[in-house]
Amino acid sequence: MLINDTVVAPATNISTQAIALIRVSGSEAFLIVNKLIKDKKLEEKRGLFLRKLYFEDELIDEVVLSCFVAPNSFTGENVVEIACHGGILNTNKIINILIQSGARMALRGEFSQRSFLNGKIDLIQAEGINNLIHAKNDLALKIGVANMSGSNNKAIIELKDNLLDIISRIQVSIDYPDYDDVEGSSIEDLTNLLEIINDQINKLLMRSKMAFKNSEGIKTAIVGQTNVGKSSILNALINEDKAIVTDIPGTTRDIVEGQINLENVSLNLIDTAGIRKTSDVVENLGILKSKNLINEADLVLFVVNKENINDLDNQEIFELLKDKTYILIVNKAEKLSQTEKQNLEKKYENIVFTSAINHDIDQLVLRINQMYLNEEISKSDELILIGLNQITLVEQIKNKLSTALSVIKSGMPIDIVNVDLYDAWNLLNELIGVEYEDEIIDNIFRKYCLGK
């Protein structure tokens, strides 16, 4: 990527909205925008300015220009943001004129990439911006904001510093074996210090994996016998008639999917074929898929009604759910008395009542949110990472530290330990972007939106 050229891109979606924002960033940002201004050319100073834009003596638009002078901008470069009138034609016309005047169309995520390369943000903050933009639920939104602000990133800096301190102590003991006055350099002291760092990394990994799954979507299978209201549950959850709903048993013969974003978790929903005894070959294939999906799912929504809850087909499903996380949903609850509900609650765990045909699924939504309200990740002020490449790096760091601990506890030569510790330290640097390869950085930022 050329860092010395000037780039342009829409910072807002190009549509028929009233106002659009176009960002120009680079050393020639003022020069290029001034080519479109007849009177009162911009000076390189910070401020807001009302100007008319022209191209070949034709008035294009009247705009507001927000000007930032390097290094005091998001990218660390000269930046001019053009608030123009919206509309697909108008916005694209101004962008094309800016390109003809010397700017280049920015790549996806290039503004954030320039900000990173110019030292305005670190890699965790950059990923936080992307997490914030693509957040599907409140948890992911909170993590994105926290990481974007950099408020929790000092945790990685402290881990790096503490690990470097251990590496240095070990190196002193290797280089000067007769010099044993270095405080905290005994095998016991080093082991204790390493265990503290290892524990911190393990907790970061655990929090991050849980948050990643909650933000990306829990694989959720809706299972049960035929005609108990599974498809109605799916339609009510996603507020869309995605699955066919009829009184004919066995209507759903294949897999129907949808997604819902709740407060603490996103669910990837799968409505499965009803499980029952049948001689229909095609329906049996769907039933086999349903049973396989029970094994694969992170969460199972098991739908029954009061008439069939105890029959043999449902007992088979209960058996399949023995080691699974599931919610028992008694649908068609409008047909149940309060006493009947209370008796079922005494007999079965994790039970809720719904009337999906009436879109009454409040109990179910509340229960799912409660199940995935993890205090450690939802109310934590500690660093949580939800980028897959970030989690992979933390896992590699954990493995390096675990190997180092095993080596030091086994009594092997201390210099062997430093090999894994130094690798772990380098991986921590990579996590925040202190050391990086161009291809890796390019790959990360190309996942961003245009204009970020």
From Swiss-Prot:
Root EC class: hydrolase
Positions bound to Mg(2+): S231, T252
Annotated EC: 3.6.-.-
Keyword tRNA processing appears in the UniProt entry: yes
Nucleotide-binding in keyword set: yes
Domain of life: Bacteria
Co-factor note (free text): Binds 1 potassium ion per subunit.
Keyword terms of this UniProt record: Cytoplasm, GTP-binding, Hydrolase, Magnesium, Metal-binding, Nucleotide-binding, Potassium, tRNA processing
Predominant location category: cytoplasm
Requisite cofactors: K(+)
NCBIfam families reported in the protein's UniProt record: mnmE_trmE_thdF (TIGR00450), small_GTP (TIGR00231)
Name of the protein described by the UniProt record: tRNA modification GTPase MnmE
